[in-house]
Amino acid sequence: MLAAFQQQQTRKFSPITNTSASCLNMQPNPPKISIAPSVISVIGVHMEKHKLKIKTGQNIVLSASILPIQATNKELIWSNMNSDIITIYPKGDTVTITGKSAGKAVVIVTTAEGKFRDLCVIHVQPYMTNPK
């Protein structure tokens, strides 16, 4: 049995002569494959607060989040429903709100494609000074 094993171990292998499957015959311009990034759809938007009280002249920053966090289009559109009461200064996922006069206003945030929105009611109270 040992002799049969030794005989198998001493066999010589001949080189491959069939070059049709070799690297030399590969296509010079292989087809290009591109993978498009997957689009992650927005499923909602959430504002951090839904009711706020501020004084006239006071500034406050409010933020909103696109859901899911990995969504492809993270653009938000901010709207002010009563520009006599507040002024808004949108910047990305935040908006700075300034109280102008006493009253109630609504700030709405909408996703860029318009499918989802959230809102915050802002109550602006007059700024009181101490009487003399």
From Swiss-Prot:
Annotated TM spans: none
SUPFAM superfamilies, per database record: Invasin/intimin cell-adhesion fragments
InterPro entries noted in UniProt: Big_2, Invasin/intimin_cell_adhesion
Protein known as: Uncharacterized protein BC_1230
Classification via Gene3D superfamilies: 2.60.40.1080
All copies of domain BIG2, residue ranges: 45-115
Record family assignment: To B.anthracis BA1245.
